[in-house]
Amino acid sequence: YVHAQDRLFQMDLARRQASGRLSEVVGEAGLENDKKFLVFSLRKAAEESYKDYSDEAKKILENYAQGVNSFIEEAKRDNKLPYEFSLLGYSPENWTPIDSLTVGKYMAYDLGGHWDHLGFNNWILNNLGEENLKQLLPDSFSKNKDNEEIIKANQGIDVSIR
């Protein structure tokens, strides 16, 4: 309840962003983001992982969702939804345990520093070679004067791109 009371709009945007549904409320500006997160399938991963949670953990997630939904119902009833919902012209949907897990997976992605491209670059280097890496990703090399040293340091490092 209290989390929603203080952060409902941010929670809703995080849920939408992680689920690939941001464009539903911000329009075309959210389409590229939606495409990316639909490919990442964080929501599907949350749905799959939920099956493996203990009954106790599921109950905690359900209680949390119930608290969020209590605030949503109260705020709708009393016309006290955060003003951002009015600005964008929509009301929040009820919260689910899957929403919590999806946002958690999004936070792990977001706080992880988006290192996925570095792993991919390293994979190209070690599987296709330095010249192919420079041809495939020329912009990466024109910006950093230390690239030759970085390439040498990264050669032979085993990296998975999955």
Where are each of the predicted segments found?
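Substrate-recognition/specificity elements adjacent to catalytic centers across diverse enzyme folds
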Residues: 1-162
